[in-house]
Every structure is written in C-alpha cells, then in structure tokens.
Regions:
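FIC/Doc superfamily catalytic core
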Residues: 1-206
C-alpha cells in the first residue's frame, strides 16, 4: 500500500518563492474585507461567472457538453436537464453549490466524498454514483496510429477504500498540525487523482 505523509512532503515545498507567494496570499486575504461590503453586487456577479466557467471547464474535459445557453440556465437552476450530459452537469452544479455554501462544515473524510460523488450522479439514475470503483482502471493514451499505451496505473480497486482513508487521514493530520491548507490541498488533490477512486467522475470530483 502506498504511503501518504504530507507533513514530510510539505518541507520540500517550502522554497523561497512558495513562501513568498503564501505570505502575499494571506496578506491580501486579510485586506479583502475592505472591498467585500462596498462591492458585494459585483462580487456576486463574479461568483456566478466563476460557477459557469468552472462547470463548463470541469465537465468539458470529460466530454460532457451542452450549448452555452443551456449551460447557463442549468447552472442558474432555471431549467431541468434533458439529456444525460445535462443531468451530469446539473449534478455537478449541485455539488459545487454544496461546497460553496457549506465548505466550512464538510470534513475531508471518505463518507463525505462518497456522498458528494453520489450527488454528482443523482439526476442520471446511474449506479456508479456514491461508490468506489468496482474494477481496476488505467490512464491510457492512443497515438496517431491507433496504438494504446498505459500512461499511469492507479491504485487497484480492492485497495481504493483504504487509500482514500489514508489520504484523508494524512490531510487532517497535517491540518491539525497547523500546516497551511494551501500546501496540503494540492498534495491531497494529486493523490486523489492518482488513486482515481471512482469508475467515472474523478476529474470533476477533484
């Protein structure tokens, strides 16, 4: 079983450039309250734009598309999904909304990841939602001649629940030790994608 040790790996990330960037980010975050209240309408507008762009990009990378008008209506929850693609987009919209509105109350734990994945597919009727992968998967590519080759071999299906528990534990241990979340999150996301825990929807979940 792979080992996940964020507290040790974090030390290698503390380059002068990264430390400088972290300092600036936290400095600007401390100043943002000066701009939030007088610009609340503009910030709300920017948030809606960000949701639309995130939904479009995250779904398109997995080949899930619809027209621009339909996408905007779906993200704004002003229409019902008609096709399978639109049902998956609507599920992503709801998961994104859940995270935006409740992120402070969503712990990084296996059962919560499964719940969010189930919500991702709640409009589709597909049985893959809310379950870890049942078969091994690979990250493969096909060259111009049609030859398929394996780029990456994720964790095997039978090891997946334990691997996810381990990365969640590593994340929480590092967070409880006071390590900056901006350092922990990219390590967690990379490990999540390397585990590739679901039969479908790994990119959108990350």
């Amino acid at each position: 079983m792979r080992q996940f040790e964020y507290k040790e790996r974090m030390k290698r990330l503390l380059t002068p450039n990264i430390v400088s960037l972290l300092t600036k980010i936290h400095e600007y975050k401390g100043e943002q309250n000066l701009f939030i209240e007088p610009n609340s309408d503009k910030l709300t507008e920017l948030l809606e734009i960000a949701k639309i762009q995130s939904t479009e990009a995250s779904n398109k990378i997995e080949g899930i598309c619809t027209s621009d008008d339909r996408l905007k209506q779906l993200v704004m929850d002003k229409t019902m999904p008609k096709t399978r693609n639109e049902k998956e987009i609507a599920g992503y919209r709801d998961v994104l909304t859940t995270i935006h509105e409740n992120y402070e109350y969503i712990p990084i734990r296996s059962n919560y990841l499964l719940q969010l994945h189930g919500d991702l597919y709640k409009f589709t009727g597909l049985s893959v939602g809310g379950k870890y992968k049942s078969v091994d998967n690979v990250i493969a590519e096909i060259d111009v001649n049609g030859n398929k080759s394996i780029r990456f071999q994720p964790v095997e299906a039978w090891q997946t629940p334990e691997a996810i528990n381990n990365i969640c534990e590593a994340y929480n241990d590092a967070l409880n030790d006071g390590i900056d979340p901006l350092l922990i999150m990219p390590m967690f996301i990379l490990d999540f994608l390397c585990v590739h825990p679901f039969n479908d929807g790994n990119g959108r979940m990350s």
